[in-house]
């Protein structure tokens, strides 16, 4: 087996579960809730960077890796937008404000917001719950607005009811100078007067210029066709970033669950 040459991006502290108190729960869509979590005495449980994730656990039920959807600039709490799709997430969706969970992390590489992305025009492309990891980056960029160029956000879902953080998108992001928001849903829906069509198709219809760096997250099949669409528009690989945490388990390159050849999603990704 080829030796992994990834850097050590964790410490002992990231391996120790920390108690988190649920202080707010927002019903985003019929099957997605956002959980606001703090340390028992208030404040964030740990520091993180945009794009990183954490292992969320309900003791006695199980644990899984979820993206941290809040920005590092938020010093009061961390947020996780979680889709109900299994035993653990069913249990998480049954919890109430005041309940406790455990969280360990952060894990995974972050988007290079302070290096490669700084000063660049940014294009965020998300599908469904894939907005959650990108929201951390988007809000970080908006909180440090002078450090970045123009921002385009292309976001789509199956229906208008499945658009996560729609109020924030319309009332904050869309009203921020230099930010352009493009929303779409897969099929026509009563009451929806916006664009109708799949994200990869809408991407090519808009025809974004190649003076941008693209950050992509969503269902694997969407990512595949979005990256192909970006290539058709003239984007090269160095201009495209995507995120993947579905295969991650330990988060530190030890369990081998997320390896692709000699690379590890959690550390090389």
What are these regions (language model features)?
Residues 2-3, 221, 244-269:
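Local cysteine-cluster metal-coordination motifs and their immediate loop/turn environment
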